């Protein structure tokens, strides 16, 4: 049963309170929620109204949730307020860890739970807008979304196959089913009286248009939260990202903020202001900076790269310190191109950004092999070079864009520490000192579920490195090869004994560059790209 839309009067989009708007969501509806971490483009007022309504009335019931990007604060925001038994029965997310209350329902087998790669999920929404049954892609082959493995299912109660293995011209692909949503929660900054919307105070666009088209073309209701409204036809047409005919309900929240907390708008993050070179931004010399510095050594002039959330995200600041940040382009999967990468939950809220694409188009570029290099954080690595990030220690985190990015990037740099859990290190006198070893080994014999396939990467001719604070590995046909160790660490005690398998030791094993361990600019010169 399709939801019933409120009527327009004289072409004006209905303007309702959030409480009135969520009354249009029927039982069993499929709700698609726009937003990214830290409050980026999150329609918080709508989410809160829906959560409160269910607490009070126990309606609507049995919703299905689609969330392409990880929105939330890794605690109680994002879609975590919707984690109420009976409100949600099914979820398909690109990333889960930013809204852990929803993840907990999946971990407890209380909801049906799927994970598509983030880029694939936004592309299936575009397919749903075009009334296409799904997409066919080689992204995800050899990983847990491959139906020969887990097929993207995250728990025991999830049974239906949404992903199928298909073959064309003797090549394997995955078919990802497109799910058409009935309701959309989207957000913009401003709209006119007919619903035409602009994003001038927002950090990015994400896939707002794709979601709105998917819901509209399948007879659903698009509910849009904005900070303000203006008169009809007063917005610049080149600034409008959502045409009014896609919008069925507008909810105005004058207290809407760009991110969680803080000022309503940070003009550096919205792209209106830029930081000049006199503004000093730097990282303290610790294991995080050490990894970012070593990762920078893998960059080349003119390269186009991606940087992921986590320990890898310091590379932009390190490059700025070294004076080479303008010699390459770093992108973020949510749309930003260039600039200084943010850190923490509001990942992608960059400053000095050069351009911003919609997220779906950014992933098209990635899937087609456009990236020269990517920097991704890892949770676990096994002896075959496989990497796991989507599920570990019993917790569902989801893949985000990890699979999309690592599947085709020409060079793949995984960044992390060798161990986890209370690891403490010091960098003194040009050496690394392990003050307190981590409790958990991250290099294990076999991964239970695979987010990155070393085997597939080698078949595709990709160059794969694993950079930690004390060791650097590369991937070859026979597995991991140790190629560098940090000065001050013992090969056996601090590296090999802290792994569940023994890597091959390169005959050219050397110390990591001594400049990495000095608390001063390295004088690093970015190498030219090989031709």
Describe the role of every protein-language-model region.
Residues 30-35, 64-67:
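Short glycine-rich or small-residue beta-strand-to-loop segments that form or flank ligand, phosphate
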Residues 22, 61, 281-284, 293-300, ...:
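Glycine-rich phosphate/ribose-binding loops and adjacent secondary-structure elements
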Residues 2-5, 9-23, 38-54, 66, ...:
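Conserved phosphate- and dinucleotide-binding cores of soluble alpha/beta proteins
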Residues 196, 274-287, 294-306, 479-480, ...:
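Glycine-rich phosphate/diphosphate-binding loops and the adjacent beta-loop-alpha structural elements
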